Amino acid sequence: MIMACHCTDCQTFSGAPFRAVVIMTRENITIDGDVSEYTKVAESGNERVQGFCGVCGTQVYAKAPDGSVYNVRTGFLEQHKSLVPVKHIFAKSKAPWIDVIENAIWHEAGPTSEQVKP
């Protein structure tokens, strides 16, 4: 299952209004390379092990302390554009403008400096 987490932890870690994750069990994951981990207490009160690429620091996953379930961050996956969340969690802390984002000005590529001046 793919979901978008709007908790304040995910907002802080990602620097974005939410973080998209795919929920997987350990036997369905293959990780190549070095992953650095640390454990923290999440907003939910649960302990979560955070996994980061040991080379570049990219967020790779969060997992339960027993390692049985992983929330794999979709942003670094090659197929991330096709991984559409079917569930949103922690709606109580979602950014209030998420509901109206389609009404904003969109650019097909990065705008020029002139276009983003206040």
Where are these regions (language model features)?
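A short Gly-Trp-Pro
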Residues: 1-118
